[in-house]
Amino acid sequence: MDSVVTLSTVLLAAATHMHTAALDTSRIEQLTGAKGKLDRAANVFKVSAPRSDLALTVGGVKLTPPSGLTSWAAFESAGSEVMVMGDMVLTEDQVNPVMSVALDNGLEVTALHNHFLGESPRVMFMHVGGHGSLESLADAVGKVFARIKEPGMPLPNATIDPANTQLDGDQLATILGHRGDLAGGVYKVTIGRTARMHGHEVGSTMGVNTWAAFSGTSESAVVDGDFAMTEGEVQSVLRALRHADIQIVAIHQHMTGEEPRVMFLHYWGVGRAEDLARGLRTALDQTHPR
């Protein structure tokens, strides 16, 4: 009996060692350009990049990196591959450039939101994840960390008054595949979806919808709106919008307990009305509302 117990213990220890050895922590640090710490009990290696460059205050209180101003990424073995999860601390003008780097290098962007109210300068938090080889994931995180060290990009702006809106609604409807309504100088298109909550169907009027609101002119327009997506649609919609140079301003949920789970992203775009509509149409084609 003792020999069986001893053999089992040896095999378990060997398996644990193999599992731990799969994480090349030195390589992770090299590729990410950040120092990390191994949680041996969880077999998770976490690298951190404190935002010590930010002089942030909230209601007169000075915040330092330990108060939640540290970008990080945690790596864990997942069978023959690796899983990563992380959170990036970004100024507003860094959000979309950093998001594009993450998406273009194979990471998923899973949430974008604020952690504070009334902070100065304003900061957003972008959560990322991924599953694949250690080399590809650590390299992607390293590129994200590197982009965070660079200056942000000016946020798009335009001098537009909805009172002077002159848009070609027929053109927008043709491009988007859905007709909208003009009210108060805003041409708004709403595309409903359905989900179930508490055993009942909820749809567009209950807020389960994608919408786009245009104002301005054909040559100088602004669009803002919201995409309702299943979890499996989020990444392709994000990539389509960013490739169209449309800004992502939030990614989150509006409900709990719905089936299927519905995620929402809010966006903002400035440019020619036709270009904005075509960018949105590409993103719409990544969704399958019913």
Please name every model-derived segment:
Residues 2-18:
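Sec-dependent N-terminal signal peptides of Gram-negative exported proteins
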Residues 58-74, 195-216, 251:
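Intrinsic, low-complexity N-terminal interaction/targeting segments
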